[in-house]
Amino acid sequence: MNLITTIIAITITLSAVLATVSFWLPQITPDAEKLSPYECGFDPLGSARLPFSLRFFLIAILFLLFDLEIALLLPLPWGDQLATPALTLAWSAAVLALLTLGLIYEWTQGGLEWAE
């Protein structure tokens, strides 16, 4: 077995074990203290279960997508040193086109409008 296969097997096994333990441990002893909200050692002043803004979530996801896009396209100037620079340019153009189409769709659907 080569090194990469061993690392992948260890990663998958460790992930499965940790996911199983994380779902299993909280169910052992649920009590009122574990289920109550915690605000820096003080009793909560209001409702601790406030609704979360879906628009804020969508804008945060868009920010993460475009931040990831920058991270993926940052090494693009060094892509011309590869064996097929045209293929590198084509893939980066495809990524940019896909993200641009997604942004246009989100804009036309009104997902970027903060106030209605």
UniProtKB/Swiss-Prot annotation:
Enzyme class: translocase
InterPro entries attached to this UniProt entry: NADH_UbQ/plastoQ_OxRdtase_su3, NDAH_ubi_oxred_su3_sf
Top-level taxon in the UniProt lineage: Eukaryota
Gene Ontology cellular-component terms listed: mitochondrial membrane; NADH dehydrogenase complex
Reactions mediated catalytically: a ubiquinone + NADH + 5 H(+)(in) = a ubiquinol + NAD(+) + 4 H(+)(out)
EC number(s) from the headed UniProt entry: 7.1.1.2
Localization per Swiss-Prot or TrEMBL: Mitochondrion membrane
Transmembrane segments: 3-23, 56-76, 85-105
Keyword field: Electron transport, Membrane, Mitochondrion, NAD, Respiratory chain, Translocase, Transmembrane, Transmembrane helix, Transport, Ubiquinone
Membrane protein topology class: Multi-pass membrane protein
An example Gene Ontology molecular-function term: NADH dehydrogenase (ubiquinone) activity
Protein function: Core subunit of the mitochondrial membrane respiratory chain NADH dehydrogenase (Complex I) that is believed to belong to the minimal assembly required for catalysis. Complex I functions in the transfer of electrons from NADH to the respiratory chain. The immediate electron acceptor for the enzyme is believed to be ubiquinone.
Protein name (Swiss-Prot/TrEMBL): NADH-ubiquinone oxidoreductase chain 3
Gene: MT-ND3
